[in-house]
Amino acid sequence: MKKTVLAAGIALVLSFPSMAAEPSTLTDRADRLDEVVYGSIQNGSFLERIDSLDTEINGSTDEKATEGQGLDTRIDRLYNEVIRSDNDSQPSLDTRVNTLEYYLTDKIKQDPLSSRVDTLDSTVFGKEQTGGLASRVTALEKAVYGDNHYELTTVTLPENTVFKISLNDEVSSKTNQVGDPVHFTVAEDVTVDNVLVLPRGAQGSGVITKVNGPKFFGRSGSLEISFDQVISIDEDTIPTVL
């Protein structure tokens, strides 16, 4: 999937490295799963954490299904199920929740997956449902979409695509230093041939690369920011260039 973007508003050109490099170790993947599902890395042994994730996602830990599976197999399965699916016809849970939120509210939240599904349940059904997140998301899709079926589509994002962003936090030459992270929010939908690539509310990140402090006699300071990447609706990372 080829995507390059130019963001205006604070005008950026996107040509993305990874927002966060794809976790390579088992520990990194488990930590990332915790962060996506719960909002923070959980305490407990590795096995306890994976069992908890399995229960949260699938409603239970099936001992027969996991018998003989090593930690790497279980973590890879959960990672593909929750964060990075290799199957366009069955996107990850995170992508499916992104799509539901966008369909219902025209924006995407950045809260933990568990609380996002709780909110969707309350919005659609009037109260939070029981069971694993996977079955609850399936029920939400059935209620919201009916018999319609949505799949991911590969598109090419034209070079120098322009869109508006807003900074999530105030930055200042008085208080910020070189190397400080900067986070931004996409302020408008970005589509290609009626296919949504970046929804309003999508998150991106960068870093402050240069700071000139305020001068004497009322001369204001300045700073430079490298806007590095933004995340698409399917959790793909798109590089950006200011």
Cite the ranges covered by each PLM segment.
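Sec-dependent signal peptide recognition
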Residues: K2-A8
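Contiguous beta-sheet cores, especially beta-hairpins with glycine/small-residue-rich turns
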Residues: E151-L242
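N-terminal targeting leaders of membrane proteins
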Residues: V137-T156
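N-terminal signal peptide c-region/cleavage motif recognized by signal peptidases
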Residues: S15-S18
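Alpha-helical, heptad-rich or low-complexity scaffold/stalk segments
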Residues: A21-K142
